[in-house]
């Protein structure tokens, strides 16, 4: 899981995504009263590429999802999958004691649920 500042331009965020081999980034809170945000590859595709915007001229704040739904580390996988389905999301920060400790996605849910049974 990688955190970035919302003032970062999208091109720089993409370079970070490529470097850490992730399709999502956590956007840091500006202060204690702020909420976490998320930037997904799909946000970049919809808000930058599809609208023919220059990624070096668009800030992460302009296209990120915020506030975003969060999950607790102890949430059961099946409930997390239902939450994703109910709210039409594919990724969520995992927050423990007001600190982001990871990111969960449909991809990771499937890997943790089905693949262990196949081994």
Cite the ranges covered by each PLM segment:
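The conserved cystathionine-beta-synthase
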Residues: 3-22, 27-29, 70-88, 95, ...
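A glycine-centered beta-loop-beta connector
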Residues: 17-20, 25-43, 84, 92-108
């Amino acid at each position: 899981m990688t955190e970035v500042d919302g003032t970062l331009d999208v091109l720089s965020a993409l370079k970070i995504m490529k470097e850490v081999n992730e399709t999502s980034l956590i956007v840091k809170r500006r202060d204690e009263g702020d909420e976490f945000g998320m930037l997904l590859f799909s946000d970049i595709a919809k808000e930058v590429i599809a609208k023919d915007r220059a990624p070096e001229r668009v800030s992460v704040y302009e296209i990120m999802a915020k506030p975003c739904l969060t999950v607790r580390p102890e949430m059961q996988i099946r409930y997390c999958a239902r939450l994703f389905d109910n709210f039409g999301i594919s990724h969520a920060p995992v927050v423990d004691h007001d600190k982001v400790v990871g990111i969960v996605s449909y991809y990771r849910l499937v890997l943790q649920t089905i693949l262990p049974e196949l081994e």
